[in-house]
Amino acid sequence: QADGAKIYAQCAGCHQQNGQGIPGAFPPLAGHVAEILAKEGGREYLILVLLYGLQGQIEVKGMKYNGVMSSFAQLKDEEIAAVLNHIATAWGDAKKVKGFKPFTAEEVKKLRAKKLTPQQVLAERKKLGLK
């Protein structure tokens, strides 16, 4: 079984070990992941971000970010599921979402076929009502 905390070490350089990000440069995950998971389509969006990256302006907790998140498509499906489970649980976000179910490799595999660009992932974010 993949170790999500260990895989997250690749994310911590930008999003920080505590999930707080770097204001103005890299958005926080802690607290924001719950907001995403609470939206219909939020689970799929989080998977898409890891598979295809994200590019363009977003807003998290009132702060704007305009950068590029790289794709992590090189990770195996079970590794992507494991790191998503880590970010959903490490800072208590999953507890804020009614009926949270752990991410699975099967969910990741289904979305891997989409072949989106980072800009298309941004469009998916906007469909969720997130800035």
Curated annotation (Swiss-Prot):
Coiled coil region boundaries: none
Domain of life: Bacteria
InterPro entries: Cyt_c-like_dom, Cyt_c-like_dom_sf, Cytochrome_c-type_DH
Disulfide bonds listed in the record: none
Gene3D superfamilies, alphabetized: Cytochrome c-like domain
Pfam family, one: Cytochrom_C
One term of GO molecular function: metal ion binding
PTM comment: Binds 1 heme c group covalently per subunit.
Keywords: Electron transport, Heme, Iron, Metal-binding, Transport
Residues binding heme c, per UniProt: C11, C14, H15, M69
Function text: This monoheme basic protein appears to function as an electron donor to cytochrome oxidase in T.thermophilus.
Name of the featured protein: Cytochrome c-552
Gene name of this polypeptide: cycA
